[in-house]
UniProtKB/Swiss-Prot annotation:
Any one Gene Ontology molecular-function term assigned to this protein's record: 3'(2'),5'-bisphosphate nucleotidase activity
Annotated binding of Mg(2+) 2, by residue: 99, 102, 222
Residues spanning the membrane: none
Its job: Converts adenosine-3',5'-bisphosphate (PAP) to AMP.
Residues the entry annotates as binding substrate: 80, 101-104, 222
BP GO terms, sorted: 3'-phosphoadenosine 5'-phosphosulfate metabolic process; phosphatidylinositol phosphate biosynthetic process; sulfate assimilation
UniProt topology in membrane: Peripheral membrane protein
Subcellular compartments: Cell inner membrane
Family: Belongs to the inositol monophosphatase superfamily. CysQ family.
Protein name: 3'(2'),5'-bisphosphate nucleotidase CysQ
Gene assigned in the entry: cysQ
GO CC annotation terms, alphabetical: plasma membrane
CDD domains registered for this protein in UniProt: CysQ
EC id: 3.1.3.7
């Protein structure tokens, strides 16, 4: 009789789930690109924090929510495009985090630097992350300590962070501030690249960039998928005080993150 390895069985179950999440991210991305390439008028409104939201955000969100509800109906979902009673969410140990269109500003600028972000949180830790950049047709994924990159439905390859003699520092294209400006003035040895959305995390994870500093506020759906991918690729994501970004809702007062940095060092 063939012996069944319990851990291999569990691992295979999670790998199959990851594959489904990757397919779901692609489906949302294809919807985004259909609207990106169309001549249809895109309705834009603004949230209280003055960030834009469009019909495209909602369309992608509906695809992801429906898909996640079929894949794992027992796991609740937190999406950027929904409203939640935070006190109820505080009791969730496991939940999905979704940003259906990360980089709406980049989408509206037509520069291609926008992504679909999906991650799974278990007891405050992002254990699974998927980032799909539909304009470039590149997908990044991670589960625990393994991270991969797949281009244009090609072969999936493992990725790892990499150090460099002349580190590349990647920063937000649309969120400059005075603290970042002062920081960059002190970092003379680094090359600097501006990039939109969670692609900054991906550049760290694949070894192209080495440092991603963020001083302004973000939300947990902005960072969780990228966090999972960087950690799985051997990097780190920490607050400026040296702590870990924590996604445990019971220890938070809101969905907002303070500043952090991701790095290969």
């Amino acid at each position: 009789m063939q012996k069944i390895n319990f851990f291999d069985t569990i691992n295979n179950i999670w790998r199959k789930m990851l594959d489904k999440i990757c397919q779901l991210a692609r489906s949302a991305g294809h919807c985004i690109m259909k609207l990106y390439n169309s001549q249809k008028f895109i309705n834009v409104s603004y949230k209280p924090d003055n960030t834009p939201i469009t019909d495209v955000d909602y369309a992608a969100n509906n695809i992801i929510k429906k898909g996640l509800s079929l894949i794992s109906p027992q796991i609740p979902i937190i999406s950027e495009e929904e409203s939640y009673n935070f006190e109820i969410c505080r009791n969730w140990n496991s939940y999905w985090l979704v940003d259906p269109l990360d980089g709406t500003k980049e989408f509206l600028k037509k520069n291609g630097e926008f992504t679909v972000n999906i991650s799974l949180i278990e007891y405050g830790v992002p254990i699974l992350g998927v980032i799909y950049a539909p304009f470039f047709d590149v997908l990044y994924s991670a589960f625990y300590d393994n991270a991969w990159k797949e281009e244009k439905f090609g072969s999936k390859k493992k990725i790892n962070v990499a150090q460099a003699e002349a580190p590349l520092l990647v920063i937000s294209r649309s969120h400059p501030n005075e603290t970042l400006k002062n920081y960059l003035e002190k970092i003379k040895c680094c090359k600097i690249k501006k990039m939109g959305s969670s692609l900054k995390f991906c550049l760290i994870a694949e070894g192209t960039a080495q440092i991603y500093p963020r001083f302004g506020d973000t939300h947990i759906w902005d960072t969780a998928a990228g966090h999972a991918i960087v950690i799985a690729a051997g990097g780190k994501v920490q607050t400026w005080t040296g702590g870990n970004l924590n996604y445990s809702l019971s220890s938070r007062v809101s969905f907002i993150n303070s500043g952090f940095y991701a790095s290969a060092l």
